[in-house]
C-alpha cells in the first residue's frame, strides 16, 4: 500500500510540474518576425460570432499583425457543433477589426491542433515560406508550437490570448496529456 501511495504522489508531482511548465511557457510572450500568424480555431457561437475565448486569440493575432510581425494571419478550424465554419467566422472577425481580407488565409480543415499544424506546413511549403507566430490560449501554446515544429515549421514566438475562465484549469490539465501524446506520436 505504501508503494502505491508513493507512486501516486510521484505521479501527481510530475503532473503538477508539467502543468506549471506548460503554463509558464504559454504565459511568456515573445515574438520575432515570421511569415504567418497561426490562430487555431475554437468555439463559434450559434449566431456565427467567435466565443470570447476565440475572440481573445484573434485579438492577440491582430496585435501581432499591427506590430508588423507577420504579413498574414492563418486562421484554422473546422465546422463546430454550432454548424459554423470556424475559419470563416475568424476571418470575418479579423476584417471587422481592421485586418485586410487579403492578409487572411482560411483553413476550414483544422479540426484539431495536429491538422492545423499540418495545414500550416503545407501552406508555407507551397508558398516557399517557413516561419510562424502562434496566437492562442496560454495553456495551448506549447502543444501548438510542438505540432508546428514537428511539421517542419520554424516558430518564432507566441502571444497568449488575454482571456481567463474557470475551465482553464481543466484545459491546462488536459494539455499535459495532449502535449505528452504529441511528444510520443508526432
Where are the model-predicted features located?
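A transmembrane-helix-recognition feature enriched in membrane-embedded lipid enzymes
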Residues: 168-186
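Enrichment for repetitive, rod-forming helical segments
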Residues: 12, 64, 150, 181-182
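Hydrophobic alpha-helical segments, especially transmembrane helices
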Residues: 3-6, 58, 175
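A structural signal for short, hydrophobic/glycine-enriched beta-strand patches
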Residues: 23-173
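N-terminal membrane-anchoring alpha-helices
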Residues: 1-35
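Intrinsically disordered, low-complexity N-terminal regions enriched in serine/proline/glycine
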Residues: 14, 92, 178-181
Amino acid at each position: 500500500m505504501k508503494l502505491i501511495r508513493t507512486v501516486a504522489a510521484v505521479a501527481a508531482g510530475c503532473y503538477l510540474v508539467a502543468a506549471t511548465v506548460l503554463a509558464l511557457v504559454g504565459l511568456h510572450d515573445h515574438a520575432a518576425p515570421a511569415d504567418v500568424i497561426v490562430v487555431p480555431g475554437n468555439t463559434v457561437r450559434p449566431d456565427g460570432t467567435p466565443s470570447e475565448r476565440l475572440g481573445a486569440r484573434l485579438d492577440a493575432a491582430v496585435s501581432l499583425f499591427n506590430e508588423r510581425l507577420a504579413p498574414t494571419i492563418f486562421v484554422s478550424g473546422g465546422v463546430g457543433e454550432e454548424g459554423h465554419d470556424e475559419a470563416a467566422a475568424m476571418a470575418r472577425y479579423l476584417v471587422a477589426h481592421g485586418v485586410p481580407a487579403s492578409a487572411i488565409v482560411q483553413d476550414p480543415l483544422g479540426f484539431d491542433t495536429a491538422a492545423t499544424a499540418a495545414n500550416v506546413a503545407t501552406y508555407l511549403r507551397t508558398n516557399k515560406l517557413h516561419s510562424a507566430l502562434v496566437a492562442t490560449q496560454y495553456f495551448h501554446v506549447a502543444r501548438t508550437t510542438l505540432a508546428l515544429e514537428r511539421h517542419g515549421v520554424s516558430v518564432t514566438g507566441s502571444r497568449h490570448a488575454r482571456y481567463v475562465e474557470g475551465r482553464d484549469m481543466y484545459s491546462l490539465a488536459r494539455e499535459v496529456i495532449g502535449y505528452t501524446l504529441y511528444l510520443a506520436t508526432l
